Amino acid sequence: MNPIKKIFFDFSSAERRWFFIALAVLVISTIAEIALAIKENGVMAPIAGGSYREGFLGQPIAINPIVSNNPTDQEISSVVFSRLFDLLSAYEISPDGRSYNLKLKEGLRWDDGQPLTSDDVIFTIKTVQNPEVRSPFMKSWQGVAAERGSELQIKLGLPLAYVFFLNNIKWLPVIPKHIFGAIPSENFRLSDYNLEPVGSGPYKFKDFTKRKDGFISQYHFVPNENFAGEKPYIKDFYFNFFQNSEDLYQALKRHNVNGFGSATPLSFNLSGIKGVTEEKLPMPDYYAVFFNQNSNPLLKDKNIRAGLVSAIDKKRIVDKVLGGNAAIVNAPGFSSTDSMNGNDSDYNQDEAKQLIMAFKTKNKNEPINITLTVPEV
């Protein structure tokens, strides 16, 4: 008989019991030591794979970042297209601030395998400058001259120095000339490539699902092997679309989608959905009314302007229209200081009446007519 077995069988019942207890303690303590060593010295690293489904209300219209003007299109475009600044290996600004020399990274390619060169960048700039395209980037690129230095180099010339022009470069998405170059500007928004995009971002278009009534229910994207940046870990990225808040709510409740993002208030409470965490992220957007004193002489009067400001109940707008998902801003731009932001409002109905009446008394009850112009969205 094996000596170890002989010793074990020579144990009494009590000795065997204590042997197993000691063995269990040894195993548990060893596992605990290993776990502690991993926790203190190990490095957690993500692995590639899996899928993610993002829910959206509404429909994609044009997954083309230089014509997109709605949040759905813009968010989808952000995973398909790269911004100009992210494609650069270097840039130089002239001492007078009017010339920018840009150099692209070597070996850039679109997700269909075609080379991405300075021709694509120049084509993008000239396209956004074309008024027939109606690009939201048009104003920020007006008057900018773009010249080809080489396959990788672009020279930009500004009519006047603009200290924030580098931000224009950082935010400009680049579109492929070999896809859109032959499309007339008047048909630019009608191209099928706006729904089957070719880009250079972290993900590339694979397919979409459309119902018989024309409603697009899902987009499917996969990692772009030609992406110049850090490769994404998620293997399959889906965008799922819903016609109303109730459908989105039910999909979230059944875990048919992993999450959603919305800049507009929704008709349901997320606290009623098990396993869902709500994260509120501040967005660099604001709603404001600007006084155009040139188009309406009435607005040159300080009492009128102050009266209009006092007459607007910002807190009620935040609570009733935006569902409390906003902060009151009392000055242009953004700041984290309490004097600029917070829940304080200039609303004072009595003061507004006094200011308006002071103007009317001064101007012999002159009628007050003001036109409010809003963007078409």
Indicate residue ranges for each PLM-predicted region.
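Ligand-site clamp/hinge motif
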Residues: N224-L270
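Short, well-ordered beta-strand elements
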Residues: G49-Q59, S99-L102, T124, I154-L156, ...
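A structural "hinge/loop" feature
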Residues: F56-Q74, Q114, F164-I175, F290, ...
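Gly/Pro-rich hinge or "lid" segments in bacterial periplasmic/extracellular proteins
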Residues: L172-K231, D236, E246, Q354
